[in-house]
């Protein structure tokens, strides 16, 4: 890394030290200021930052920071979901009070465009979202603006999160009829996973590599052949905020596309499809992964101009 990159990592580590000393991660002036500083530090795209190659100390800070961000995000969503459900009219008419609502609108549009391209016009009838939380904005945005006839099943292990989320949509005559909430550990869900055309996996379900891969393996075992798995990942300095999903974490899936936003949408998006027959071991050895090149120029025209599409050429050369 160059001097500027080292300074960036040091700034992130300094912010971690300050955040780790907070008495609470619930929304407050101090919490809001520090997390805004952290996000603004990590958002600028920087391909020179590869968190997987950093020293053990920075790796440990990163893992701790991801956990802290997950807790803070949960508190933030809980806070705003509680406010929204206090409205006498339809709470979904006031979603713009959530400070990151516009990011979810952009992310929802991006993910819908990816689905539209890779499903060749097929509209999913049933979608699962794993790790939906108290403010299930991805499901709400997709159901409201993009998949207007699709049924959404939201899974979360926290009963209080599901109670808030269910109350949030209960006043909407359309969404309330198409959105369902299940309080369960997804590792205990088996047969019903076969009924979904698309499964979304939230960024913070599986906060480290081992946990994430364990969930992916479970989904691969029980999802229907040909079903789509959408995942959130992170790239560059943004990987200090969210876990990274690598193509080779997706054994038994064909990775169709990986998109790295360069605007204020933090998460990268990985879209994959379960193989009808697991044949990964036949390509370059048991630990290799299959990649299908996408029509980048066609897709890029549909995306926000600030989105960056990862090139697959280098990866494909490695596999050949």
UniProtKB/Swiss-Prot annotation:
Protein name, as recorded: Nicotianamine synthase 3
Tissues expressing the protein: In shoots.
Record GO terms (molecular function): nicotianamine synthase activity
Top-level enzyme category: transferase
InterPro entries with a match to the protein in the record: Nicotian_synth, SAM-dependent_MTases_sf
EC numbers, comma separated: 2.5.1.43
Conditions for induction: Constitutively expressed.
